[in-house]
Amino acid sequence: MTSSSASSASAAGTRQPVYSQRVEGVGTVTLTPVDPVADAPLIHSWVTEERARFWGMGGASRELVQEIYEDVDRRTTHHAFLARRDGEPVGLFQTYDCAEDRISECYEVLPGDTGVHLLIGPTRGASERGFSAGVFGAFLSYVLSDGSTRRIVAEPDARNEKAMTRLVRSGFELGPEIELPEIDLPEVYLPAKRARLAFLSGPQGG
């Protein structure tokens, strides 16, 4: 059983939770917009671990991580959130408007397509059965709660079998492999990436 509540995103800088869901066997999962300055040290420690190699920021400095999330914070089409379980940070989640992202060059974007990225943070002690699925499920519930998302789109690295297994277990259907183009702009650089599309239709998506 789960219980949830959602609120509209707060003004930039307040960094209050925008979503809270009680997940049985996991705890209370909250999602809070990333504060690029305050959260950069934590995010940097996560994305530079070997286990996060598919996130693509393994060689990034803390300063670069802060700059990247400052850029995300300025955008209205891209958003980043820290997930907490009972107040403890456990994951980094990102959403984006597929029509306003490089992925739009790789497949036919439909109205209501929202892209997602997921990084579960390192666990303390023994791994908990169902933990990652519970946290990811809360995130998906949040994405669908605004009423405008008709389909959730994921594009994990094509080599990331673990991520694709998690997506399938969460109800996603795997699509074709794509080549995300390189982005080289003054404010952001993203290398080309071989990825695998995955889709999850929401209640409004049929």
Language-model segment annotations:
Residues 45-59:
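Helix-loop element at the rim of GNAT/NAT acetyltransferase active sites that forms part
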Residues 1-4, 18, 39-40, 89-206:
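Acyl-donor (CoA/ACP) binding surface of acyl/acetyltransferases
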